[in-house]
């Protein structure tokens, strides 16, 4: 009887140890990102890195929020995952579809990225004119990268001179602690100033309350 009791105790101890080891191997459950947290990751271009760092544990949650609830930040994340084959089977066309959905819902990061893709010919055929509306919309919503990229394209004679005033005003009212971006903005502003009448430059500086 004693031998049976000892054997049973040993089996229980071994089972508990195995469970603890398995839990340690898997790691603690990863909480789903809040929309605010995800948007910040996207703005820092760290969203795919974060998904990889979380060992792809949140794929089902991400897919559900993108395809069933249609949350724009999650549509963008899922689209980017598909486009680059991160934690899911690569499907560039479907990835761009979800990124476009996020852009249509007004997510600035999605608008900026699609505009950048068209401008540089990433995943899609290069079309700088097609990039302009995406970048312009993102710039109007405060996306700094879009503001810089839009001004660069305008100074290379893409888009319309009618956009100079808005592009200048957005740069003039942009705030950044990044010294390289700060200098780049100053260079782009000077370039636009050379193409604009002084009264339009003055008006762009005054209308800082209109976005």
Swiss-Prot record:
Annotated Gene Ontology cellular component terms: plasma membrane
Location of this chain's protein in the cell: Cell inner membrane
SMART domains per the UniProt record, alphabetical: SEL1
Keyword Cytoplasm: no
InterPro entries attached to this UniProt entry: Sel1-like, Sel1_AlgK, TPR-like_helical_dom_sf
Record membrane topology: Peripheral membrane protein
Keyword field: Bacterial flagellum biogenesis, Cell inner membrane, Cell membrane, Ion channel, Ion transport, Membrane, Repeat, Sodium, Sodium channel, Sodium transport, Transport
Superkingdom of the source species: Bacteria
Broad class of the protein's primary localization: membrane
Cell inner membrane as UniProt keyword: yes
GO BP, sorted A to Z: bacterial-type flagellum organization
GO terms for MF: sodium channel activity
Function: The power to drive the polar flagellar rotary motor of V.parahaemolyticus is derived from the transmembrane potential of sodium ions. Force is generated by the motor on coupling of the movement of ions across the membrane to rotation of the flagellum. MotX interacts with MotY, which is the presumed stationary component of the motor. MotX may form a sodium channel.
PANTHER family the record matches: ERAD-ASSOCIATED E3 UBIQUITIN-PROTEIN LIGASE COMPONENT HRD3, SEL-1-LIKE PROTEIN
Name of the protein this chain belongs to: Sodium-type polar flagellar protein MotX
Name of encoding gene: motX
């Amino acid at each position: 009887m004693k031998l049976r009791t000892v054997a049973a105790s040993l089996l229980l101890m071994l089972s508990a140890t195995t469970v603890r080891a398995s839990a340690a191997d898997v790691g603690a459950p990863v909480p789903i990102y809040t929309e605010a947290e995800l948007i910040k990751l996207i703005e820092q271009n760290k969203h795919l890195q974060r998904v990889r760092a979380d060992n792809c544990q949140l794929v089902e949650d991400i897919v559900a929020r993108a395809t069933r609830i249609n949350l724009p930040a999650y549509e963008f994340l899922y689209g980017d995952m598909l486009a680059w084959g991160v934690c899911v089977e690569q499907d560039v066309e479907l990835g761009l579809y979800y990124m476009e959905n996020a852009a249509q819902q007004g997510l600035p990061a999605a608008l900026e990225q699609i505009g950048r893709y068209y401008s540089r010919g990433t995943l899609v055929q290069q079309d700088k004119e097609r990039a302009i509306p995406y970048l312009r919309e993102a710039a109007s919503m405060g996306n700094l990268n879009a503001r810089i990229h839009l001004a660069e394209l305008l100074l290379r004679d893409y888009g319309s001179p009618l956009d100079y005033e808005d592009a200048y005003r957005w740069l003039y009212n942009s705030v950044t602690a990044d010294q390289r971006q700060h200098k780049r903005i100053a260079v782009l502003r000077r370039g636009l100033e050379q193409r604009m009448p002084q009264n339009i430059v003055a008006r762009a500086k005054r209308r800082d309350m209109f976005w």
